[in-house]
Amino acid sequence: MNRREFFKSAAALAAVGTVAPKALAHAAKPKAGNNPIWLMTSAFASDPDFESVVARAKQVGAQGLELCVFRRDTDRQDHIATHLDYDNFTPERAKKVIDICNEEGLRISVGAYDNLIGGKPELQVVNQNHILKLVRIAAMLGGDANDVVCGTFVGYDQALAAEDGGFEKNLLKFKKVFTPILKYAKGLGVTLCVENCPMEGWVPASSSACYCNLPGCLAARKLMYAILDDDSNLQETYDPSHDVWQHIDPSDVIQAMDFRKLRRVHIKGTRNFPNDAEAVNWGRLFPRQRVNAALEKKAGLPELVSDEKGGNWDRMNYEPRLPGFGGSDSCDWTKFLETLMAKGFKNPFVIENEGFNSSHTGNMGATLQGFRATILNTAPVVWPLGPNGYEFDKSALKPMTTPNVNPKVVTMADLA
């Protein structure tokens, strides 16, 4: 129900003298689903294992976890964590994880977000092989039968991008790399979900371009599906915050996408700064550029801090936030969530906490407060109204089943 329909309904009730607070509350409430709200465990890098992040989920009232399972020797320095032992994951451990999920009323997925098609060739293969390990883990946790997906980036080859037709060449490389990965995953009953962050900080601020993850825009994702011979087990984790700083209404993206491909939605806020000196000087469509510091000062331009201090991530005039925690951001969350509900989205929302006033403080109390606030901010649109307020209906959870599988560990060389 939109605003106009609400006031029309209220006026009709008033005309017959039956306007009551309860009636108005129901009139104002769009049809809610019963979507679980999960936490992404990247905010808990200091927590050592699965059991510790289960406790975090229970602390804040979440219904699940997107378990970050990055390589412990990853070259990434930001927002990484490892909460399952990917090198020693056994059927016994899988059963234990499933048993804990059933006991605690939680559900899970796994993921690691690295560059699979760009960067040093040897590192690309390491990242690809790691995703194959996570596909194996997802299968041992039940895969699609238990709604356990494997989240990943695609990445981007900057060397190819510099050539004529570089974007299409990246599409072709994506097809070459991901076709055997997807075939392997499909054989194990696992879906891969790609996330849409452009990862602008993966290149130094001296780089003129900063598009570093192929599915960073809707057109790219449509082209990815089109170029594959079999896209049946490739889906999306959509994060609206990345489109917000590109000055795109994420509700429009939801309307324009293949909705059948939407498996997860990340909840993360963005506050744009369109009038900052950086935006006024450099524009809002292209990244700030690093130049000689003395020249920058002579020209009277705002200083761009070093990459070591985050300058490579501070080029698009925004800050990460959490909706409902410490003020507003630049996303119309009511519109976005209601758009999803109207289209029948029934899958998990996953809070990714990169809030400057929450996880980025380094304070665990503030991190947990941010998660709690975002759950409460989201609940009135996605949960039914019960006797104790808006709450998730736990009776809708189906028990996770324990598959009797133990796939061997494979590498890209094995799949060639």
Task: Locate each region found by the language model.
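Glycine-rich, proline-tolerant flexible connector loops at the mouths of alpha/beta enzymes
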Residues: C68-K95
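Catalytic domains of carbohydrate-active enzymes, especially glycoside hydrolases
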Residues: V53-R72, G142
